[in-house]
Amino acid sequence: MIKQYWTKQRIWLLIFLMVVGIGALLFTSHNEQFYQQPIAKVISKKTMSKQRVKDQFDNVDHQYNQQLQVKLMNGKYRGQKLTVQNTYSDSQPMDQRYRVGNEVFLTQLRKQGGKLTANVNGYKRDTVIVFLLWLVVLMLLLLMGRSGMFAFLSVVINALLFIIAIEIDLKQNGQHIMLLFSVLAIIFTFISLLLVLGFSKRMLATFAATVIGTFVALGVSMLVFMWTHERGIYYESMEYVTQVPRPLFLAETLLGSLGAVMDESSDIIATLFELKQLNPAVTRKQLFISGRNVGKSIMGPLINVLFLIFMVDTFTGSLLYIKNGNSWGYTYAMNMSLGTIQSLISGIGIVLSVPLVSLFGALLLGKKVQR
């Protein structure tokens, strides 16, 4: 079994990926000269002071003043050393603690009176990001082979399309954001399924169920919004929004629920396809019932996972609200309600996609009963 898995092609692929990974890590560890922003390496640190702070809500924290000696890694002052100050706290909400060996970005680097001065502006993280990306590609290609390659390719293409869509939205100042991201959702679905499943009946059934289930769920939610006059929905709680928040929230919900619906539809279709392979004479009714039963099994866990994903995004903000004397009700309304609404809309899409994908799968894969 092990010999069958580790073929000559896989061994050469592993060697190639290891060489690429080591090369990429070495490059990102020594690429400071390609950055315009000054980069320095911490060569020594010293804690100068420690202060206990307390706010009006009796929250206690400690602030530290670090004195860092750093060595410049790029620019016209490369190789020179300077001393910078850094203030951080135990909670580290908006600050960071630096250690010897860290590479950091500097701002406001200048020479005054023959002495260099600057401010610290965060870690240089490209090595960590490249390592994680390489690890994902390594596992995809080694464990999934060609399917993993196409899955990664679909992610890259979708990411590029997403960036293009954001640029278009910024140029239009959000005037057609729902139309833009609705078209993008359809393209996302088509490209992802085409690359992963290929152009087949499985792909068509999954595509139809995903698109219909997602948009029907969004349509149902918009009807509910209209009937309730959107009472209890606090769009003003969305952070850093420079456009009209309502369509932006709906576009965000559309893309968020799309992945879950596509995941469920793909699982059901894969099961129906296996049943068809095992029993070519299986009828459409049998496939429909089987698909519905599979959907019932995975529907609950998938909704819960989606709910947790939406909620965990608000966890730290909720703690901050409560620690600053706000009630649970106000914290939920201003920090968690939109995530709950997104979870409910996605749940509607997940529920609707079960009969839809079972129906499409049965029609395309099943055998018509002869009368």
Model-identified regions with their sequence ranges:
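Hydrophobic secretory-pathway targeting helix
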Residues: 1-39
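Membrane-cytosol interface segments
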Residues: 39-99
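Extended, hydrophilic extramembrane loops/domains of integral membrane proteins
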Residues: 90-127
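Transmembrane alpha-helical segments that form the functional core of multipass membrane systems
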Residues: 134-138, 146-256
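Juxtamembrane helix-boundary/capping and inter-helix hinge elements in multi-pass membrane proteins
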Residues: 200, 275-285
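Short helical (or helix-break) motifs at transmembrane helix termini and adjacent helical loops
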Residues: 257-275
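Membrane-interface alpha-helices at helix entry/exit sites of multi-pass transporters
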Residues: 282-303
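Hydrophobic alpha-helical transmembrane segments of membrane transport and translocation systems
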Residues: 293, 297-300, 308-371
